Amino acid sequence: MSLSLGAAIYIALKPIFKIYTIMLVGYLVAKFDIVSMENAKGISNMVVNAILPCLTFNKIVSNISWRDIKEIGVIILSAFILFVLGATGALFTTFATTVPKKFFWGLIFAGFFPNISDLPIAYIQSMGNGSIFTAEEADKGVAYSCIFLFIQSFLMMNFGMWRVVGLDFRDTKEPDSENITPSVSPAIDDRKLTEITKLPNITRPTNAYQSEDARSNSDLSCNSITTNEMTPQAFYEGFTGYIKPYKESNGASHKFESDLPHAEIYRVSSTYSSPGALEFSRIDGSSLSYSRISKNSDGRSYRRKRKADMNELISKYSAAEKIRQGELDLSRPLSLTEEVGSRNASIGNVHTGYTDESSIEEENCTNMATDGRGSLSFFIERHNLKWLQYFIINCLRPASLGAILGIICALIPWVKACFVTTYVHVHKAPDGEPVLNFLMDFTEYIGNACVPLGLLLLGGTLARLEIKSLPPGFIKSALLMTCFRLIVIPIIGVLWVNKLYSIDWLDTGIGKFDMILTWSMPSATAQVYFTAFYTPACGDHIQMNCLSVLFVMQYAILFITVAFVVTYTLKVDLKV
């Protein structure tokens, strides 16, 4: 079968149109606050910890066998070359252009790790309609992409390379937290009333009829807390649990939590049910704007939802205050069930980071039962094996575990035969299928949701990026890095893959296509969350601004570069 040039271009563009349309839906969903940042974070955790492991396990077990060991080795080698080549391009960019000192390591990270998860998988799945590749070949290509993704995840999480982003924040000066947050404890004393009365710059909320521009300029600053007119006596009615409500002439009641984290800011806003009632809502970042208050024709007030912005993203992911206060130890693994953990994980009784009174009591009650694990902890400390502990704990991440189990099951013939039909004879279930085939049905059913949800989240992430200010000359840096990432590296990738094919290290067309496509991807969007993790709530957010410019440039021309590379691959390399 021979395709015309126009047909090849259309086939190359069609998957891109689908991908960009899904991303557009995610963009609009985030912009109109249909899915809040909190909900998006929950969905992201679900994808990473439940859906992605199912997809990885299913595709690897179904399409990889011991006969593919050579291809797996080639993929691993090619992945390391791709990562090193991207980092080299980032280093060249730092020497050739003016890159801010506070974004040096961020640019290195952006060059090192490409987006080899949702985008290439979605593209390859779209090509499996029989015109170029069969459905079986497309599934095998997805399995190859899952191995690429596993290698990147292994380096990023198991070896802790995600912490490279934090090197840009070493010189960040944290604002004095005493000037921005009140510290309230359950103890009843007059000192708490004095602290509350000294809150700086208490201002009234913005007028209900003010313009959008005026409202955007009334964001909370790092040294102010927005509240309604409330007397200090309203707070000082008791400091156990919630502050006891008091009654004004209009019958409004107020409540306040006494158990306030040190680094959090609280605001007062009108509730939906009663315009007179006030409630405190917690804000993790102090630069979030107040929800706009309007009135309808009946005179009832209501609040309009805030537009999605970068401050909201930072407020949900930032752990800068916890790191500064020592509540989070980055030399130890973070939570295994979050994409970007907000607390430390632990092994045995090696507690990491923050511990509260209940955890201390629990530890005291179980000391007798954990002597062995305590000895293990002592052994790890004595022989300086924390790096090994970090590596092993991160192997228990669902994303890593799904790939590891999938590779093990796929490379052992009689184990694989328990899941899918192979040449190895094993006893079948009554329906003629392998005994554990129901697990393949389960993982396939759940894994099918991975790519659409991932693309929706990608669009939502891009919607929350903002460019507020840029260092002089960084536009040239971002442009050069974009050209290197999306033009130079794909050209080198085509040459590399053709060399592998000529020496019989790659045997299949889908293997060539998947590898060339992987080398054509933009920077990993996971960097947005890692950067937000280190970003303080207050400040100029220079790292997020630079990262926003970089992603906007890359995704603005991605559809052109990928279409060109795929068209060339189809006509010249695959000769279709």
From Swiss-Prot:
The keyword Transferase does not apply. It comes from the Eukaryota. It is found in: Membrane. Keywords: Membrane, Transmembrane, Transmembrane helix, Transport. The chain crosses the membrane at residues 9-29, 46-66, 72-92, 104-124, 142-162, 401-421, 438-458, 477-497, 513-533, 546-566. Its main location: membrane. PANTHER family: AGL149CP (PTHR31274:SF1), PROTEIN ECM3 (PTHR31274). This is Uncharacterized transporter YLR152C. It comes from Saccharomyces cerevisiae (strain ATCC 204508 / S288c). The lineage of its organism: Eukaryota, Fungi, Dikarya, Ascomycota, Saccharomycotina.
